[in-house]
């Protein structure tokens, strides 16, 4: 799809938001949002434009493999990739034409639209249309 213009952010489930913040600050990231929300999320931004969303993990089994956002039990690890798009309607039409189901659509308070799909292995992909 030529409407994808780049990676918007990466989601990472962590055991401690404070520990993650301290580590990623050493790499040049700066906290820009949070922690906020019922399942606390903190957002850090690198001067290069790389954006990481850290989501607090509340499950103690570190060896488990479920990191998907829409399942009730969570574990550490990457949760999804977010691809930035520039034409929401064209993307929705292309997904429908390819019989790729949209699992969730979210409109953020700033007007951005998020469409969630899964790859054949069940990995979550967010298609992010900025406001």
Task: Describe each model-derived feature in a short phrase.
Residues 124-127:
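Short glycine-/small-residue motifs
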Residues 19, 88-92:
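Short, conserved charged micro-motifs
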Residues 10:
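Polyanion-binding surface elements
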Residues 14-17:
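Conserved beta-strand-loop-alpha-helix junction that forms the acyl-donor binding cleft
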Residues 1-7, 30-82, 92-118, 130-131:
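Vicinal oxygen chelate
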Residues 85:
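A short, basic/aromatic alpha-helical/loop segment that forms part
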Residues 20-25, 95, 122:
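Conserved active-site tyrosine of GNAT-family acetyltransferases
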């Amino acid at each position: 799809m030529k409407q994808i213009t780049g990676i918007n952010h990466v989601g990472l489930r962590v055991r401690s938001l404070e520990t993650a913040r301290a580590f990623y600050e050493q790499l040049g990231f700066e906290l820009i949002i949070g922690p906020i929300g019922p399942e606390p999320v903190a957002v850090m931004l690198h001067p290069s434009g790389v954006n990481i969303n850290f989501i607090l993990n509340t499950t103690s089994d570190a060896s488990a493999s479920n990191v998907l956002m829409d399942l009730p039990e969570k574990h550490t690890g990457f949760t999804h990739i977010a691809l930035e798009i520039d034409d929401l309607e064209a993307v929705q039409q292309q997904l429908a034409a390819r019989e790729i189901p949209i699992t969730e659509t979210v409109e953020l308070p700033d007007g951005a639209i998020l469409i969630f799909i899964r790859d054949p292995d069940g990995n979550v992909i967010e298609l992010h249309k900025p406001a």
